Amino acid sequence: MGVQEMDPLTQLSLPPGFRFYPTDEELLVQYLCRKVAGHDFSLQIIAEIDLYKFDPWVLPSKAIFGEKEWYFFSPRDRKYPNGSRPNRVAGSGYWKATGTDKVITTDGRKVGIKKALVFYIGKAPKGTKTNWIMHEYRLSEPTTKTGSSRLDDWVLCRIYKKNSGGQKSSCSDLQNKDISHASSSSSSSQFDDMLESLPAIEDRYFSLPRVNSIRNFQQNDKINLQQLSSGNFDWAAMAGLNSFPELRTGNQVPTPGNQTPVLINTNQYHNHNDNLNNFNEFFANSTALNFHGEVKFEGGVDQEVESSVRAQRLNSVNPGFFQENSTGFSSSYTNSVPDPFGIRYPTQTVNMGFTG
């Protein structure tokens, strides 16, 4: 079943570099049509044999020219005397059609049909498939008379042996790997380019006054909680008094009109080891405290905030904001505590759980 190698250049005394690779249209128009019409060729490059009398591996030795593909003019016989089916039995096996027929046209006109066949060793339908392939070209119009044993006087056949499945699959795997690597690299490069093309996020969208005030409020709450755990308490900050520049230690708050100013005396609070026995005493006048302030925010956006804080008379029963009980530490809040955030603390006894 081996193929006998022959030097095509010495077969026809052809010049170096000569190759015979005709198209489907050229095979039908320039060769088969001329052969059926009885025209002679100046160069006989396609042999005339009864192809169905030989096994395919013998055909290369019958060819006039070819290295890996061999061309033949061959007649086709009828399988049945009055039938239209061709006889596909050849040598030790048979040719079996595969795929669909391809219509060949020239100048928009149908000129012939191309059919693909595979050779099987043995008898149909239990033959063994081989790698030998045939492309059969026939004209659209029948070339024989009715009643003849010949189905076609001449058809043109191309014979070749395809590569084994192992070699084909290995080449296919290499191509798939290259394609996959190239596609992944291309996708990664496109993703990087897309990220670089995105505009930078401007910081001014994150520096708005409302956002900053919420962020500062959260940070202040976190600091106050940390101070509770460490034993250092700044009750003025917790009550929201230190958020106003006028209400600082030892300062006199300016008041409009003839109102009596509020004096705030803040002492250093004792640490946790002293059991928090000494507390600040806050004295407030009986008149209301009106405070008007204007706050400007950075970030390119100015927002004017007008707040009015009115301090009411403190509970005469409890002169101080805070009072120690038997548990070691407790606090009583009143609704009179001014708060810049508009939050009023309910009047109830809160046990912090600190003991001496």
Curated annotation (Swiss-Prot):
GO terms for cellular component: nucleus. This is NAC domain-containing protein JA2L. Keywords: DNA-binding, Nucleus, Plant defense, Transcription, Transcription regulation. Expressed in guard cells of the epidermis. It comes from Solanum lycopersicum (Tomato). Residues 14-162 form the NAC domain. Induction: Induced by jasmonate (JA). Induced by wounding. Induced by infection with the fungal pathogen Botrytis cinerea. Induced by coronatine. The keyword Transcription applies. Plants silencing JA2L exhibit enhanced susceptibility to the fungal pathogen Botrytis cinerea. It is found in: Nucleus. It comes from the Eukaryota. Pfam families: NAM. Transcription factor that acts downstream of MYC2 in the jasmonate-mediated response to Botrytis cinerea infection. With MYC2 forms a transcription module that regulates wounding-responsive genes. Involved in jasmonate- and coronatine-mediated stomatal reopening in response to Pseudomonas syringae pv tomato DC3000 infection. Regulates the expression of threonine deaminase 2 (TD2) through promoter binding. The NAC domain includes a DNA binding domain and a dimerization domain. Residues 111-168 bind DNA. Its main location: nucleus. Residues 163-191 are annotated as: Disordered. SUPFAM superfamilies: NAC domain (SSF101941).
